[in-house]
């Protein structure tokens, strides 16, 4: 992004108007099921662009150990940030009004924090 997309976006004056991101609620377990690892929740997301408050980690990095307070059994780790919180933050930046966020992020009402604050 730093060496490919950003110079082009800067050249055309769009560096603060374009945001690149990955989004998934898919993860893997810490343990093997004999054929690999099973499906689980959580993962690392990437957000890049001129309007991103970068250089920070949003959420809490869990202790990746069986039996830790983050692990709920079967090697499954509970994420500290919901995919819907992530989506709602981006949707707000795109201009979606707060009352409409549940159309984009259906479970956003389950969280005290709707906007994670990573967009300017």
Regions found by a protein language model. Give the residues of each.
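Extracellular/periplasmic catalytic domains that process cell-envelope and extracellular macromolecules
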Residues: 13-16, 37-41, 51
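Substrate-binding rim/cap in mid-to-C-terminal beta-strand-loop elements of soluble/periplasmic
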Residues: 42-74
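Hydrophobic, well-ordered secondary-structure elements that form the walls
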Residues: 25, 45, 90
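Short, well-ordered loop/turn and helix-capping segments at boundaries between secondary-structure elements
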Residues: 32, 51-53, 92, 96
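Metal-dependent active-site segment of extracytoplasmic phospho-/sulfohydrolases and closely related
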Residues: 9-34
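Short, solvent-exposed loop/turn and secondary-structure capping segments
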Residues: 32-35, 57-58, 102
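Membrane-interface soluble catalytic domains
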Residues: 10-15, 65-120
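Short, small-residue-biased leader/transition segments that mark boundaries at the very start
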Residues: 2-6
């Amino acid at each position: 992004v730093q060496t490919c997309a950003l110079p082009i976006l800067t050249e055309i004056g769009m560096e603060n108007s374009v945001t690149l991101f990955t989004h998934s609620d898919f993860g893997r377990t810490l343990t093997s099921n004999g054929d690999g690892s099973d499906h689980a929740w959580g993962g690392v997301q990437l957000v890049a662009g001129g309007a991103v408050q970068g250089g920070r980690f949003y959420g809490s990095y869990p202790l990746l150990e069986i039996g830790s307070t983050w692990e709920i059994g079967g090697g499954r780790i509970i994420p500290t940030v919901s995919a819907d919180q992530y989506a709602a933050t981006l949707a707000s930046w795109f201009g979606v009004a707060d009352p409409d966020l549940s159309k984009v992020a259906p479970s956003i009402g389950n969280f005290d924090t709707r906007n994670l604050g990573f967009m300017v």
